């Protein structure tokens, strides 16, 4: 099924700092449309911590033909009284070929005493250079896109 639009609305009760991570509950309402059909899913889980600095993880995968490197960079996140902005950047490369994917999500924050509209926006971009094997590029684009979506939802 192909979703034509995905919107997320989030209510976060308390902001969590990277230094003191605690279990804070958050409720996300995810609405997806497919033609005339509208699907809604409500998820309650612990809130992601606010990352106040940039952190990078590197994953190296080797097989008999090549070595592939994936670099995931998160943060820094910014927080105001009304919203939190999270940025996730994925870099996937093979040799001289590099694919860069960035997604930024702004989540509305509500305190327990006030009520405001929740909204979510995202932007993504992809660029590539070099000549990695087509099968690797196709598989990596799909895997990274799926990883981005599952991480941010």
Curated annotation (Swiss-Prot):
One BP term from GO: siderophore transport
Residues in the signal sequence: 1-18
Biased composition, class Low complexity, residue ranges: 85-98
Source taxon at top rank: Eukaryota
Record's comment on post-translational modification: The GPI-anchor is attached to the protein in the endoplasmic reticulum and serves to target the protein to the cell surface. There, the glucosamine-inositol phospholipid moiety is cleaved off and the GPI-modified mannoprotein is covalently attached via its lipidless GPI glycan remnant to the 1,6-beta-glucan of the outer cell wall layer.
Covalent lipid adducts (GPI-anchor amidated glycine), residues: 130
Keyword check for Secreted: yes
Name assigned to this protein: Facilitator of iron transport 2
């Amino acid at each position: 099924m192909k979703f034509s639009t995905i919107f997320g609305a989030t209510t976060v009760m308390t902001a969590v700092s990277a230094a003191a991570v605690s279990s804070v509950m958050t409720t996300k309402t995810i609405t997806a449309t497919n033609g005339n059909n509208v699907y809604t899913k409500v998820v309650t889980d612990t809130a992601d911590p606010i990352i106040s600095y940039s952190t990078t993880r590197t994953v190296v995968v080797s097989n008999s033909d090549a070595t592939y490197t994936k670099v995931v960079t998160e943060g820094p996140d910014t927080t105001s009284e009304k919203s939190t902005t999270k940025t996730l950047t994925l870099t996937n490369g093979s040799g001289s070929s590099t694919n860069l994917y960035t997604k930024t999500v702004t989540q509305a924050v509500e305190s327990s005493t006030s009520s405001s509209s929740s909204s979510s926006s995202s932007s993504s971009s992809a660029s590539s250079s070099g000549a990695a094997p087509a099968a690797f590029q196709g598989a990596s684009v799909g895997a990274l896109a799926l990883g981005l979506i599952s991480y941010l939802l």
